[in-house]
């Protein structure tokens, strides 16, 4: 793990949480290392933390700090070398009619309702399916970096023009875009909204002439997290170094 003294973060303090049940691997406990105080974690500092394996959830900046497990691997896609698979090309074509709008952070009831429906359909019984408005806003609408909402609606040629289908939260950083969270209309089981959102973010990163799309943690043995290795070429932060990660 990257040594904290190597980071230009002398004003920050870091602490380890108490163990808690792992959300991704059964019968495992997890711990996190948290960076504080949050008001000092502006864009430049967060960019350094991101490259050291940290992520943020609202104003909470953390990285895995488990005692006997290194399953969580921070990932980033090499944007200029990305080569879509056949299924990814199909997803891009299928949802090409969606209209994406980039918005400033702000509460919209329509977004919150889609978030609730997504959690109830995709993650029922989890920690987030009962989030109230305050929890939703703390999780997704609080940020001290350059963050945006991307909403995707059915286009004018669709039978339901303007219908909200998906929302993504992204951070615009020095070396790329960091994909924070995406939720979508999970009632359409034939859709590939999640894949499309990643492909859209890749295109935006390329247009900004930035090298990386940060996708969060890859966990090989977790169905919820292993899909990320489908986006190649990808690098993972392993033994303090960014190196090729194929997922095989």
Swiss-Prot record:
GO cellular component assignments: cytoplasm
Chief place where the protein resides: cytoplasm
Family note: Belongs to the R-transferase family. Bpt subfamily.
Alphabetically ordered keywords of this record: Acyltransferase, Cytoplasm, Transferase
Catalytic activity: N-terminal L-glutamyl-[protein] + L-leucyl-tRNA(Leu) = N-terminal L-leucyl-L-glutamyl-[protein] + tRNA(Leu) + H(+); N-terminal L-aspartyl-[protein] + L-leucyl-tRNA(Leu) = N-terminal L-leucyl-L-aspartyl-[protein] + tRNA(Leu) + H(+)
Gene that this sequence comes from: bpt
GO BP, sorted A to Z: ubiquitin-dependent protein catabolic process via the N-end rule pathway
Coiled coil location: none
UniProt-recorded name of the protein: Aspartate/glutamate leucyltransferase
Cellular localisation: Cytoplasm
Functional note: Functions in the N-end rule pathway of protein degradation where it conjugates Leu from its aminoacyl-tRNA to the N-termini of proteins containing an N-terminal aspartate or glutamate.
GO MF, one example: arginyl-tRNA--protein transferase activity
Highest taxon in the source lineage: Bacteria
HAMAP family xrefs: Bpt
Enzyme Commission number: 2.3.2.29
InterPro entries, per database record: Acyl_CoA_acyltransferase, Asp_Glu_LeuTrfase, N-end_Aminoacyl_Trfase, N-end_Aminoacyl_Trfase_C, N-end_Aminoacyl_Trfase_N
Presence of keyword Repeat: no
EC top class, as a word: transferase
NCBIfam families: PRK01305.1-1, PRK01305.1-3, PRK01305.2-3
